[in-house]
């Protein structure tokens, strides 16, 4: 059944003369009146290398849409660079910005009654924020990311942002060497080159079904990234007419992002050792979609999904550009499908089922198309470059080695245990998360005395000051969604542990979270958090912490009676919390529920 255009409320009828006059002042031509209005939700900013190249691409998408007869209007969202906001109180704003982005998209699209939208996202909180908005609005939507940064190179070795952070804190590394690394770590526009949060989310968007193949892995500088934007423009027009003219609801975000799609996305995340932040974001997006996807589902999937792909920071051998050469996300999904670990019947924005898309785009499929071959041969150029789509270098050959290549088959998995795990115990009754793909198997079982800090800053000072020694478990409390507030990323503490050469000799646990760039025995999202009365807030220096990844447990060696009788450890830090973050803290849920705002 034909649907009424939402935009007709501002373009049709005598009483809308004023609105039509304003639309005309926005550039709408008379022949475009009554045609679908498609919002272009851009996230261009000159604060973030993952977004610095998006200035003109929104207008390219607008031109492509308007060639096909619709009217397109662009607006921007905020975007925070977690790497620049890291290590100071700017990080308190990062996770809350996800909800601000979701709200701003909802406000703009509903206020102006747009009929559909193209979301141009890229970095950490922007993609999930836009996805949350898409679930709320439930209008035809296509996502296309700005693409990953090329990996840096020094002395024939790949490097990235995390190398710069670790080496700069290592006193044995000279200033000259640090300068060399700093100047080569981030050579192009795009989101940082490892399987960090931004790239993880852009890859998962392919699995959810709201982005086209190649969205997560074709580098930002390649011409085929520009082609993705053109393809997205064409597709959003097709899907807009499918919904409003033909009444086809299969193109709507909630029809695509079902429980099964979230299970597929999480299975992919586990298989590729993605960022632990994706757990927060998938839970939050599913909450907005009203899909029945919970922390227990993640625990269940982590016990049966193997690790099929290892990328920085879990290894320095491969970066996202190498995943693309190995067939991208469809390459990983193809191996998961062969093992029966994903539901291939789910639908996608391109009208195919996931199974049909795998058959067409998995480079090991006998039916792989030429378009797929071209996408996945898209290579890094190896030059400093801040311009989207400005190079067309191609690999001579694809990486189809599923035994020893970047992407493995089930038989040759990096580990039978997946790349992420949910642990529970008496200091995490509602769960916590560890990226097992980044943990050396020699410390999957770890027991040690606690060194407790009530802030990230105190932990950094303690680690660099020599208070943390081999065998310790660093415990950082009151950094959860409420306690921070804002649930800071603990990338600097984990980097400093590595800079002290303790990466395989210490653990770190927190009710805060970690950057996608974190590796090592780093356990976050402990729920309930200290600020909500969680037992992590009762741990004292010297308490023995027991971590067992194979058994999925984490405990402090105290009886239930001892824990119940012990008071919360007083918070000694001094931290100014502005009203905006106090408002966030008053509404936010625990990490095991995605740190969503709880609003009746």
UniProtKB/Swiss-Prot annotation:
Q: Is Iron included in the keywords of this UniProt record? A: yes
Which residues get modified to N6-carboxylysine? 125
Q: Which reaction does it catalyse?
A: (2R)-2,3-dihydroxy-3-methylbutanoate = 3-methyl-2-oxobutanoate + H2O; (2R,3R)-2,3-dihydroxy-3-methylpentanoate = (S)-3-methyl-2-oxopentanoate + H2O
Enzyme class at the top of the EC tree: lyase
UniProt-listed Enzyme Commission number(s) = 4.2.1.9
**Which keywords fit this entry according to its UniProt record?**
2Fe-2S, Amino-acid biosynthesis, Branched-chain amino acid biosynthesis, Iron, Iron-sulfur, Lyase, Magnesium, Metal-binding
Pathway(s) this gene product operates in, as recorded in its UniProt entry: Amino-acid biosynthesis; L-isoleucine biosynthesis; L-isoleucine from 2-oxobutanoate: step 3/4; Amino-acid biosynthesis; L-valine biosynthesis; L-valine from pyruvate: step 3/4
Catalytic center at which residues? 515 (proton acceptor)
* SUPFAM superfamilies with a match to the protein in the record: IlvD/EDD N-terminal domain-like, LeuD/IlvD-like
In this chain, [2Fe-2S] cluster is annotated as bound at 123, 192
Q: Does the keyword Metal-binding apply?
A: yes
- Identify a single GO molecular function assigned to this protein: 2 iron, 2 sulfur cluster binding
Q: Which InterPro entries match?
A: Dihydro-acid_dehy_C, DihydroxyA_deHydtase, DiOHA_6PGluconate_deHydtase_CS, ILV_EDD_C, ILV_EDD_N, IlvD/EDD_N
As cofactor, the record names:
[2Fe-2S] cluster; Mg(2+)
Gene Ontology biological process terms from the UniProt entry: isoleucine biosynthetic process; L-valine biosynthetic process
What does the note accompanying the cofactor annotation read? Answer: Binds 1 [2Fe-2S] cluster per subunit. This cluster acts as a Lewis acid cofactor.
Tree of life domain: Bacteria
Q: Which HAMAP family match?
A: IlvD
User: What is known about what this protein does?
Assistant: Functions in the biosynthesis of branched-chain amino acids. Catalyzes the dehydration of (2R,3R)-2,3-dihydroxy-3-methylpentanoate (2,3-dihydroxy-3-methylvalerate) into 2-oxo-3-methylpentanoate (2-oxo-3-methylvalerate) and of (2R)-2,3-dihydroxy-3-methylbutanoate (2,3-dihydroxyisovalerate) into 2-oxo-3-methylbutanoate (2-oxoisovalerate), the penultimate precursor to L-isoleucine and L-valine, respectively.
User: What family does this chain come from, according to its entry?
Assistant: Belongs to the IlvD/Edd family.
The protein depicted here goes by the name: Dihydroxy-acid dehydratase
Species this protein is from: Bacteroides fragilis (strain ATCC 25285 / DSM 2151 / CCUG 4856 / JCM 11019 / LMG 10263 / NCTC 9343 / Onslow / VPI 2553 / EN-2)
């Amino acid at each position: 059944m034909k649907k009424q255009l939402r935009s007709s409320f501002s373009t049709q009828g005598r009483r809308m003369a004023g609105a039509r006059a304003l639309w005309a002042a926005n550039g709408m031509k008379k022949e475009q009146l009554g045609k679908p209005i498609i919002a272009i939700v851009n996230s261009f900013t000159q604060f973030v290398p993952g977004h610095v190249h998006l200035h003109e691409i929104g207008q390219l998408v607008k031109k492509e849409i308007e060639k096909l007869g619709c009217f397109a209007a662009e607006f921007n969202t905020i975007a925070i660079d977690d790497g620049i906001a890291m290590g100071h109180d700017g990080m308190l704003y990062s996770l809350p910005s996800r909800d601000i982005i979701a709200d701003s998209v909802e406000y703009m699209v509903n206020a102006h009654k747009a009929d559909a939208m193209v979301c141009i996202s890229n970095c950490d909180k922007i993609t999930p924020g836009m996805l949350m908005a898409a679930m709320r609005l439930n209008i035809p939507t296509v996502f296309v990311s700005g693409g990953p940064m090329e990996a840096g190179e020094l002395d024939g070795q790949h490097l990235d942002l995390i190398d710069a952070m670790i080496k700069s804190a290592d006193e044995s590394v000279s200033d000259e060497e640090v300068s060399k690394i700093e100047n080569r770590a981030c050579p192009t526009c795009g989101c940082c080159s490892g399987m960090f949060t931004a790239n993880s989310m852009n890859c998962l968007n392919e699995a959810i079904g709201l982005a086209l193949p190649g969205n997560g892995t074709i580098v930002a500088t390649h011409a085929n990234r520009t082609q993705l934007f053109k393809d997205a423009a064409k597709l959003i027009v097709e899907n807009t007419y499918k919904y409003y003219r033909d009444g086809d609801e299969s193109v709507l975000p909630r029809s695509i992002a079902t429980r099964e799609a979230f299970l597929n996305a999480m299975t992919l995340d586990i298989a590729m050792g993605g960022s632990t932040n994706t757990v927060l974001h998938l839970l939050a997006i599913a909450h907005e979609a009203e899909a029945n996807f919970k922390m227990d589902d993640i625990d269940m999937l982590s016990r049966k999904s193997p690790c099929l792909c290892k990328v920085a920071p879990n290894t320095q051998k491969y970066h996202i550009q190498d995943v693309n050469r190995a067939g991208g996300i469809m390459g990983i999904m193809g191996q998961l499908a062969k093992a029966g670990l994903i539901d291939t019947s789910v639908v996608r924005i391109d009208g195919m089922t996931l199974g049909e898309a795998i058959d067409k785009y998995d480079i090991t499929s006998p039916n792989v198309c030429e378009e797929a071959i071209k996408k996945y041969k898209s290579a890094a150029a190896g030059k400093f470059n801040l311009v989207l789509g400005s190079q067309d270098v191609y690999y001579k050959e694809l990486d189809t080695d599923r035994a020893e290549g970047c992407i493995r088959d089930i038989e040759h998995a990096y580990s039978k245990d997946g790349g992420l795990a949910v642990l529970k115990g008496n200091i995490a009754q509602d769960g916590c998360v560890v990226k097992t793909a980044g943990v050396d198997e020699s410390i999957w079982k770890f027991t040690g005395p606690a060194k407790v800090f009530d802030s990230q800053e105190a932990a950094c000072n303690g680690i660099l000051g020599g208070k943390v020694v081999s065998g310790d478990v660093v415990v950082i409390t009151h950094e959860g969604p409420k306690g921070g507030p804002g649930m800071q990323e603990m990338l600097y503490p984990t980097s400093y542990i590595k800079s002290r050469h303790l990466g395989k000799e210490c653990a770190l646990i927190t009710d805060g979270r970690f950057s996608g760039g974190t590796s090592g025995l780093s356990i976050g999202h402990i729920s309930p958090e200290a600020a909500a009365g969680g037992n992590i807030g009762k741990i004292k220096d010297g308490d023995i912490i027991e971590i067992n990844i194979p058994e999925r447990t984490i405990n402090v060696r105290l009886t239930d009676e001892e824990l119940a009788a012990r008071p919360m450890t007083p918070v000694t830090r001094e931290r100014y919390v502005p009203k905006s973050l106090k408002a966030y803290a008053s509404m936010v849920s625990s990490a095991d529920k995605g740190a969503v705002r709880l609003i009746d």
